[in-house]
Structures are given as C-alpha cells and as structure tokens.
C-alpha cells in the first residue's frame, strides 16, 4: 500500500520556491498580522479591516511560496489505499466504493443494493483522529501547556492533522492522502469573490472566519518558534499560512462529535471514509456504538447498485453550508437568515418587556431567524415580537393580570393573539424590517439570476451569488408573508372580530402540537436561534433595536479584547480570551451536530 514518493515541497510555478526570507523579516510580518487581528474594527470598518489583514496575509504567503507540503499524484489514486486501510482496521470491506459524481465531487457509490436503515458503514475508534489521539501524539506536550489548544478542540485537531501529515509513518496517512488539497470555503475565495457577499447577512461571519484564522496562524507561528514544547514538532521549521488554512478547512468541513472512550463527554473527531458521503435532505442516520466502540451509519433510504449514498448533515442554513462546508445546497428545506433583534435599554417600557420575555425564556437581545418556508418566523420569534409590540396595559396584563402565568404559554402560539392591534404591529414590523434588509443589497434578485447564467462564472463567485440570492428570496417571502398577515389582522380589527381567549383547558392543545409548543420548552431545531446577545454587542444592538419607524440596521459584530496577558514570548501581542471567543464564534455551528461535514 502507498506510493513511492509520498510527500514533496509544493512547486511554485516555473520559478520554484521563493528567495529565502530572513527569520527576523518573517517574524516582523507575523507580529504585525497578530497585532492587526487582535484589535476590534470600528463599526462599519469591518471590510476595510479585512482588506488590510488580507494584504498582510498575502505578503506572508508570497514569502512562503513553494514551502507548503503537498502529495505526489492525484487524490483519486489514494482511494484504494483508503478502502484497504479501513478493512485492515476493522471497517467495512464491501458495499460501496469512492466515486466521482461530477459537480457534487467525490462521494460513496453503492456496489450492491442497500436497504433503508441497513448498517452499511462503521468506523472503529482507532481509525478516528480525535482530541484524545492528539493528546497522545507528538502534539501532547505542547497541548498540555497551551491554553488555546486546550480551549479549542478544532484548533487541536488542525495541528494534529498537520503533524501527522508531516510524518510519513503516520497510521492515518491513508486517510490524510484522501483529503482534498484545497477547499471551497471562503478562506479560499479571492478578495473580489468575498466582495460579492457585501451587504448580505453572511458577510460578517465570513470576515470573522478569515480574521480568526489569520490571528490563530500568527499566534501559533510565534509559539512554534519560542515554546520549548514545540521544539520536537515536525512543523517547527515549515509552518505556512497555506498549511494552516488547509488544516483548518479540513477540520471545519469534517469535524464531528463522538463520546470519549469512557463515554463521559463529547469530543471532536475526524471520521475517515464516512466523511466522503455527500448531503441530502432527510434525517440523522449516524450514531456512536459505545459497546463496539465505533461510529455507525445506516442507510437513509433504499439504494440501488451504482447509486450515490447520501447522508443528512443536519439542519444547516446555506450560509452555514457555504461558510463551513464550501458548498450551496439548492433544495435546502432548512435555509434561513439570521437576524439580531433586541429591546432598547433606553426604551421606557424596557424593564416590563424584559421581564415578560424572561418569563418566556427569551433574552431581551437575541439572535433569531427568518425561515425559507411558512411560517417565516418561529414560535420564539413570534413571542418576542408580540412582547416587543405590547402596550403598557398589555404588558401589565401579562405580568399581573388574571391568568398571567398561563398566558406566557400562549406567546408563541399563533392561535392566541395578544390583540388585533398587536398582531398588526408585529407583522408590520416584519414587513418593514424585511424591506429594509432587502435595500442593503447591491443587486436585485433578477440581477443575481442573470449573473448565475454566465458560463464563465468562477465556482466561488457562483457560491457567493447563490447565497446572497437565497437570502433575498427568504426576505422577499418574509415581506410577502408579513404583508398578508398584516392585511388579515387589519380586516379582523375592522370587522371587530372577537379575540380568541386562552383558557386553562387549552394547555392540552399547546402541549400536543409541535407548532404550538409553549415557548419555555425552547424546542428549536436551529442552535443559534434565541441565543443571548453578548454584552459587548448590546451597544450595537441599540443602533437597530426594532424601532418601528424604519431605522436602518448597522451590521457590525464587535470583537473586544479584554487586555488579559498571554504566555511566553507572545505576551502583549494577542488576547487569548479574545482569540478563544472569536474561534468559538466561527466554530460554534460546526461542532454541535453529528453529521456536519463537507460535500466533496
């Protein structure tokens, strides 16, 4: 098994490697990058900051040209080694093979008929790359002494992958050979391709992802040069930005949670072979068998011989798929647009509204979502908007009135309006909000559709335009839904229709209908909806605090260093707490589901 010449230094065109750069010159550039990435951008200056950070990164990449490690041969040449390695280590020996599916990339193809719910793929723990295997590897000594590696499992996995890639005798080499040499995440976009996302709801996550990655790279470059525990790492003499970008993307597109060996907690892992499966709509069909100590996957549906085998990655939005997985899923039943909403602390009724929201289990400032289907808002967002639009008398009724405790259960139930006027206000707000958000885009939906018809459009440009078009379509549907609901309730008010009243006996209805669950049960599919907005972002939220007068939204996400000292030679250059916070923001959505990985 294996190829004669496994690893080589990357060729840099006809010119080969660049002229040697002095360590001092490189360290000066790295220090400048670290300093730039460790401060928060001023509101509205996020793009300008991105351009500056990218400029520094490109200077570093130019000086590192020719120093990155790649493998001989094509990726496809190594798939037979991957299958043989899996069989040798207790994995499946038949039923599927790795195949090229054109625009979908590589995936798994059935080599026989497979029945729905049939166990067709299993991966023993010894094949997995995990945080535990990293701690037991050459990376262990540095991991035990570095706070960032300890706090961020995804970064630990990235370094584990780099260290094993640099070791020709690594037991995971057949898996590492099978990984793509480049990805389609925004970390690989050209600046003009990222620019296509300006004005979208996704742009801030894209910019933060790049900034966090650059900051981590600069921090660890300095650490590898100065920390005694790094002296034996194979990365010490060659650690390029391209290498780190590749490792981060490999982990970001593939990381999954599995139990530790004792089953006591969940840790991040890379799952060879299984992560070749592409995504489709459906249900989670993968789990971990603690008794047999292996990851197991059953078929999502019946598959005929030669058909592609799909799995369901989870309820991700297309923004999450593009940013964290590098693809756009056209028929995404779970697509949505994130919006940050909050009750202004300067509002006269803030305390009363915050109290009603608190009783319903909803923060006064939170992240919600507008969905691609009907209704466009969740029960939690409906409850928030109802409270936001309440008059003082309505607030008193929900705080002190007869049956106040029971009424909290109705806030997210569309069948029990607070009042016709309240419904008109909240749907008017949704209509206005969606219209304002649509005005922030630089192109129309029709213009985006025309652009997507161009045959010479780059893949990354296509992803960016598909994503911004999908956002607009969700907002357009929300606007139309808001208008229809507003007109409906205006008619109810005009007709003086009787208002449905909640009775204690209605609790059975609330508890037995998935769409009418009491808000306090917090049963939400999307992990990000309803998260409390951190205090450092509340000042920004004041700028777009749901005022019904149509105030335009500001789109910055603050990152604030707290000035805490760092360790070793990196002291004073970067705030570790800020770094941890930034990376958690970019990884939060990828580390919480069983089947969140890339489409090949």
Regions found by a protein language model. Give the residues of each.
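E2/UBC-UEV (E2-variant) core
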Residues: 145-161, 338-341, 349
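Signal peptide-directed extracytoplasmic domains
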Residues: 139-140
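Long, positively charged leader/targeting segments at protein N-termini
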Residues: 2-127, 132-135, 163-600
């Amino acid at each position: 098994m294996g190829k004669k010449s496994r690893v080589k230094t990357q060729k840099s065109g006809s010119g080969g490697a660049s002229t040697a750069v002095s360590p001092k010159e490189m360290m000066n550039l790295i220090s400048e990058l670290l300093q730039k990435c460790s401060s928060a951008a001023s509101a509205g200056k996020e793009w300008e900051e991105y351009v500056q950070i990218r400029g520094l990164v490109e200077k570093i990449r130019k000086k590192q040209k020719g120093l990155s490690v790649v493998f001989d041969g094509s990726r496809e040449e190594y798939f037979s080694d991957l299958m043989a390695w899996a069989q040798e280590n207790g994995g499946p020996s038949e039923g599927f093979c790795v195949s090229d599916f054109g625009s979908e990339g590589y995936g798994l193809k059935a080599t026989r008929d497979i029945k729905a719910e049939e166990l067709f793929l299993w991966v023993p723990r010894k094949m997995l790359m995990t945080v535990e295997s990293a701690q037991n590897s050459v990376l262990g000594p540095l991991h035990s002494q570095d706070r960032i590696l300890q706090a961020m499992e995804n970064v630990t996995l990235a370094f584990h992958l780099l260290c094993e890639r640099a070791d020709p005798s690594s037991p995971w080499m057949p898996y590492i050979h099978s990984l793509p040499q480049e990805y389609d995440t925004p970390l690989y976009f050209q600046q003009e391709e990222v620019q296509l996302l300006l004005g979208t709801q996704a742009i801030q996550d894209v910019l933060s992802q790049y900034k966090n990655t650059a900051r981590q790279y600069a921090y660890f470059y300095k650490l590898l040069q100065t920390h005694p525990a790094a002296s034996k790492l194979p990365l010490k003499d060659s650690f390029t930005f391209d290498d780190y970008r590749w490792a981060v993307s490999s982990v970001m597109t593939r990381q999954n949670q599995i139990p530790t060996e004792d089953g006591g907690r969940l840790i991040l892992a890379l799952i060879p072979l299984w992560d070749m499966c592409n995504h489709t709509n459906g249900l989670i069909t993968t789990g971990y068998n603690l008794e047999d100590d292996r990851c197991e996957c059953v078929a999502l549906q019946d598959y005929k011989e030669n058909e592609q085998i799909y799995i369901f990655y989870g309820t991700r939005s297309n923004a999450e798929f593009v940013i964290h997985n590098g693809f756009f899923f056209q028929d995404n039943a779970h697509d949505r647009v994130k919006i940050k909403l909050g009750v202004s602390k300067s509002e006269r009724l803030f305390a009363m509204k915050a109290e009603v929201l608190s009783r319903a289990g909803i923060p006064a400032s939170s992240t919600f979502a507008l969905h691609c289907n009907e209704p466009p808002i969740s029960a939690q967002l409906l409850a928030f908007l109802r409270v936001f639009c309440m008059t003082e008398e309505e607030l008193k009724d929900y705080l002190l009135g007869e049956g106040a405790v029971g009424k909290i259960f109705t806030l997210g139930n569309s069948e029990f309006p607070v009042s016709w006027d309240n419904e008109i206000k909240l749907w008017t707000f949704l209509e206005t909000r969606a219209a304002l958000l649509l005005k922030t885009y630089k192109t129309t939906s029709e213009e985006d559709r025309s652009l997507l018809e161009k045959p010479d459009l780059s893949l990354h440009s296509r992803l960016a335009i598909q994503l911004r078009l999908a956002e607009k379509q969700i907002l357009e549907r929300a606007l139309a839904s808001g208008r229809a609901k507003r007109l409906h309730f205006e008619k109810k008010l005009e007709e003086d229709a009787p208002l449905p009243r909640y009775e204690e006996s209605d609790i059975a209805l609330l508890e037995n209908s998935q769409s009418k669950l009491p808000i306090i049960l917090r049963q939400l599919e999307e992990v990000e909806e309803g998260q409390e907005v951190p205090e450092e972002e509340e000042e920004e939220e004041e700028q777009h605090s749901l005022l019904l007068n149509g105030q335009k939204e500001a789109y910055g996400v603050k990152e604030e260093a707290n000035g805490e000292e760092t360790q070793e030679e990196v002291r004073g250059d970067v705030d570790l707490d800020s770094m941890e916070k930034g990376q958690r923001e970019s990884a939060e959505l990828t580390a919480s589901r069983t089947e969140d990985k890339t489409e090949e």
